[in-house]
Each structure stands twice: as structure tokens, then as C-alpha cells.
Amino acid sequence: MSERFSFDLHASDGKARTGVIHTPRGGVRTPAFMPVGTAATVKAMMPESVRATGADILLGNTYHLMLRPTAERIDRLGGLHRFMNWDRPILTDSGGFQVMSLAGLRKLTEKGVTFKSHIDGSKHELTPERSMEIQRLLGSDIVMCFDECPALPADRDRIAESMRLSMRWAERSREAFGDRPGHALFGIMQGGLEQDLREESAQALRSVGFDGYAVGGLAVGEGQAAMFDCLDYAPGFLPEDKPRYLMGVGKPDDIVGAVKRGIDMMDCVLPSRSGRTGQVFTRHGVLNIKNARHMDDPRPLDEACTCPACRNYSRAYLHHVFRSQEIISSMLLTWHNLHYFQEIMQGMREAIAGGTFEAWEAAFHAGRAQGDIEPL
């Protein structure tokens, strides 16, 4: 393990890259998918189960944790790693995205954002300085600077104004973060779908200097084609020798397309949220376990999968426990989905290292186009 934060790039194939992010709590193999532990837990999963899926790092949510149980309480109890029993790296978001999503419950100024809690209506203020303090109290390994993320579509003037505010907040975040060996601060590029604004944002962030860089403001309603158009150029504005993180993505084909365009890290609630609602990701696309076609099917969700749900249980059983609203349904389907997402990441890492990413991508899309296996 490294005592400092660093990033080693091991191989590339086209724009796709593979390497390792080194932290005092262990390495993160890239490209990496980060399961989301919103309130200090990946819903329906034990920490050791999350690790067993192949995850090297989790994401925690500053907004939710600052409200309940509070960052100060987590700090008194030994920090987020001890609190949730996860001894690997943790990345925390800044809270900005969730606060900006509150719409009528928040007020935006140059200083920061004041908002009302969705839990009890209490009033709070989140600024770049307060966000850095909260993430320090949590003990995050990777800290995200505070930013504003406008929903798309939005007009150019609104996007430009928002991006420049985020860049001023990035400078304040950098200053408030200070020098913390072993911990990293990532800047967040904004600019919507405007190439020149993305470049301006990247230049502003590079002039400040960060340990890694995120592409923010995507997967917020613009659609996959527009997102990929932006990713065709945006990662190229960022330093080659630093990790690149696409926030809030996503679906399996979004993940593969992002890695193809030079992204190293991603996060999304999709695999865990979908598991709780009966949506299952497999090599042959998405299936809905509540459908009656699975009622008498003795086969696993995916015959090539080695997760506990596929090794030990039939579609018929998983259909039954889902329809019966048994808690084990959420546990098994979430485990399967997270395992599948990590298998995608491992497949891409191996393909990039071997110079066969294009062939791997073609096989990935062919499998999904094939569709789920026919019912018995």
C-alpha cells in the first residue's frame, strides 16, 4: 500500500486506459466502478459482500451523511470507514448535486447554498469550505470539490454562469482542503454540452491543480448520444497522468462507451436500486424477475455468472421471493447486479491490457443484442 495518493497508468488501447490508483487504504484498479453507499451502506449488502463482488472503492454521500447521522457524529465514532466497517478507499461527493436537486427548497448565492432538509425541514448552509470540512470529518480518501450542476437542457448563458461559479468554488475548495497527505481532492469540470466551455473549465481546474479530475454535468437528461459526443472531446482537456471520473454513470453500455472515450472511474446507484425493484442485468441484457415467464424456470439468471444468486438459486426461486417481498430478494438481486458490473470492469481491464478492447466491446454489444434466453 502507498502512503500517498498516486495514479499509475499501465496500458492504453485507443483512448481506453487501465491502471491503478494508489491510496493508503489500498489500490483501486481502473477502469473502476464505485458502488454507491448513500447513507453509509450499499443498500441490501454487507460490506464484505460488496468487496466479494470485486469492488475496490465505495462512494459515500455528503448531503445525506451531513443530515443523518451528521459528520460530527461519524467523526466521534472513528470516521466513516470504521462506522460502516469498510477498510478500503471511500470517495465522497461534495453534496452539491443533491442540494441543487432540491429546487424550491434551496437558495444559491456566491457564498454557497442554503437549503431545507428533506428529512425534517431544518435549515442548513453548504459552502465549499463546509463541504471540505464535512468530508474531512468523514475521513474520505477521495474528496470532491463543491460545485453546481445545472440540469440539461439549459441555455448557454446559464451553463456558462454556473460553470464559472463552480470554478470559483473549486479554488475555494482547494484552499480549504489544504495539504492532507494520503488524501486526494478532485476538481469537477462543468460546461454542459458546450465544447469551448468545457475547455475553459478544464483550463481553470488545471491552473489550480488537483489530484484527479471529474467530468460533471452529464447523465442529467441529455441522453446517451449527446453524452458520448461530449466525452469524445472532454477527457482530452484533462491531464493524462491523473484519474478521470465520470459522475453518476450508469448503465452498462454507458460505462463501456465512457471507458472507450478515456474515463477511468464511474459510480451509479443503478445496480443496487434495480436489484431492489427486480431489474436484473445480464450478458444478454436486462430482465424483469417479476415477470411470470420465470415462475417455473430452474435455470440461473445468467449461466456464466459466478455470483451467489446464480450459483445457488433458480429464476423460479428469485421470482418467488421477489413477488413475496422477501428481503432476501433485494440481497441476492443486488449482489448479482453489482457482481455483473464488476465483471464488466474486469473484462475491460484485461482487454485494454491485452490490446483487444475493440473485440471485447464488439462481443459485449453482441451479447446484449442477443437478448435474454428463451423461456422453457
UniProtKB/Swiss-Prot annotation:
Give GO terms: molecular function aspect only. Answer: metal ion binding; tRNA-guanosine(34) queuine transglycosylase activity
EC number, as in UniProt: 2.4.2.29
Which Gene3D superfamilies does its entry note? Queuine tRNA-ribosyltransferase-like (3.20.20.105)
Binding of Zn(2+): at which residues? 305, 307, 310, 336
Establish whether keyword Metal-binding is in the entry: yes
CC terms in the record's Gene Ontology section: cytosol
The record's annotation in NCBIfam families points to:
Q_tRNA_tgt, tgt_general
Q: What task does this protein carry out?
A: Catalyzes the base-exchange of a guanine (G) residue with the queuine precursor 7-aminomethyl-7-deazaguanine (PreQ1) at position 34 (anticodon wobble position) in tRNAs with GU(N) anticodons (tRNA-Asp, -Asn, -His and -Tyr). Catalysis occurs through a double-displacement mechanism. The nucleophile active site attacks the C1' of nucleotide 34 to detach the guanine base from the RNA, forming a covalent enzyme-RNA intermediate. The proton acceptor active site deprotonates the incoming PreQ1, allowing a nucleophilic attack on the C1' of the ribose to form the product.
Give the protein's recorded name: Queuine tRNA-ribosyltransferase
Organism, by scientific name, is Ruegeria pomeroyi (strain ATCC 700808 / DSM 15171 / DSS-3)
